[in-house]
Amino acid sequence: MTRKDGRAYDELRPIKITTDFVKFPEGSCLIECGDTKVLCCASIEDKTPPHVAEGEGWVTAEYSMLPRANRERSRRDVDKLKLSGRSAEIQRLIGRSLRAAVDMRRLGERTITIDCDVLQGDGGTRTASVTGGFVALALACRKLVEEGYLGSTPIRHFVTGVSAGIVDEQPMLDLQYSEDSRAQVDLNCIMDETGCIIELQGTG
């Protein structure tokens, strides 16, 4: 069996990250992993949710797909009057992963919200969102330092994600949709720059 796009089984798709893709957020990027494209934007607010300890900050995330990000149109969550279970699960994963990157005490009493909007989905949207979300987060934190609000960046780890799986009994890295949709095992791995695993999420 060979992969549809000609990659080796342990080969990533080409990755391209365009920073400052839109001008209004404190940090933004477009991440492209093969044909998967996700717009990630970081917004800063000078307040925190009630559950956050005094003097600390918070990082959270939201995730959605454009109606025609896939082969067939899907309804917007707002049209269904509730967040889909899949979107809720993915944005919790993104939020947990990105919080592992930040020293909340150093961030101070601020909330950084990462919006991840899938423009085109061809597998690996959640791991692309984690990677792109981290880039947007780091850019927003750099802006806080450059504008004098912080003395140093609160980023303590670099965070990224990649998918892996087993398709037709063959282990593979970075599954595209044609592989993901028929995988016997689908695994998402979130790690930092030291190789420490932050989260594993798998189905089989």
Spans of model-derived segments:
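A short glycine/serine-rich beta->alpha loop
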Residues: 79-83, 116-125
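Glycine-rich, flexible beta-strand/loop modules in the N-terminal catalytic cores of phosphate-handling
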Residues: 21, 29-107, 197-204
